[in-house]
Amino acid sequence: MQTRFLLCLTSILFLGCVVIPSSVPADPNATPVVSEDFSKTSKVPQSFLVLNGEVTLAATNRNRFLALPAKPLATHGVMFGPAMRDGLRVAARFRGEQKGRQSPAFGVGLNGISGYRLRVNPARRKLELLRNEVRVHEADYQWVPGQWTHMMLQVRELPGLQWAIEAKVWNETQHIPAAWTLTWKDAEAPLAGRPSAWGTPYSGTPISLDDLQVWRID
C-alpha cells in the first residue's frame, strides 16, 4: 500500500518537516498496465503466478502486502503483467530483516524466468543485473535492513538492434533518483516474458513485497 514517510528535522531554533514521497511519480511517456497495492484484496490475485513456496497476503499497521516465506531456503516470488520482449517497465518495493550476518536477496525481473533480473545482494553490497541467472553487470549498493527498498527495471529497444536495460533503486527515506542507478546495453535480443518480483530468505525471515507496478514505455 502506498504510504508517505515524514522526516522531522529539529534543532533548538528550528522545527520543520520534510515529506519524502514513496510512490513512483507519473511519467507522461509510460502507460500503466498493472498497479497492485493489495488494499482491495484478501488473497494473492488470480492473475499472479506464484513461483515456489507459499506466497501469502499479510498486514501490519493497516498496510497489506505479499509475504514471501522464510522457508524453505529457495527463491520465492510472483509473475504478473503481460509477456513482452521490450518496451516494459516494472517496479516494486521490498522489506527484509538482517539476522546476524545473514541478509535476504531480492529483486524484480523482466522477460520471464530466463530474462533480466535486478537483484539487491546485501552480502556483496551490490546491485546486480542478471540475464538467464548469469551476472552481467553490477553497481555498489548499501542496503538498509528493515526499510522499504524501492526497485525499478525497464528494457527498451535502441537503434541498431541493441537493447537498453536501466534500473533505479532507493529506500523509503530517499527521493527516487533522477539518474539511473545501473545501465547496461545488450546486443542479443531478449525473449518475451512476464515481469516478476522475488526474494531469497537467507536470513531465515519472511520478505515483504508491495506496490507492484508495470508500465508500457514509449
Predicted feature residues:
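Flexible glycan-contacting loops in extracellular carbohydrate-active proteins
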Residues: I176-S208
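Extracellular carbohydrate-recognition regions
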Residues: V24-V50
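Secretory/extracellular carbohydrate-interaction modules
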Residues: N61-R62, A67-R131
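Short tryptophan-centered beta-strand motifs in secreted/extracellular beta-sheet-rich domains
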Residues: F38, A92, Q147-L158, I165-V169
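Short, aromatic/His-centered strand-loop micro-motif at the edge of beta-sheets
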Residues: L130-M152
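Extracellular beta-strand elements of beta-rich domains used
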Residues: F38, D210-V214
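Beta-strand-rich interaction surfaces with strong enrichment in secreted/lumenal proteins
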Residues: H76-P82, H137-W143, W198-G199
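Extracellular glycan-recognition surfaces and repeat-rich motifs
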Residues: T41-F65
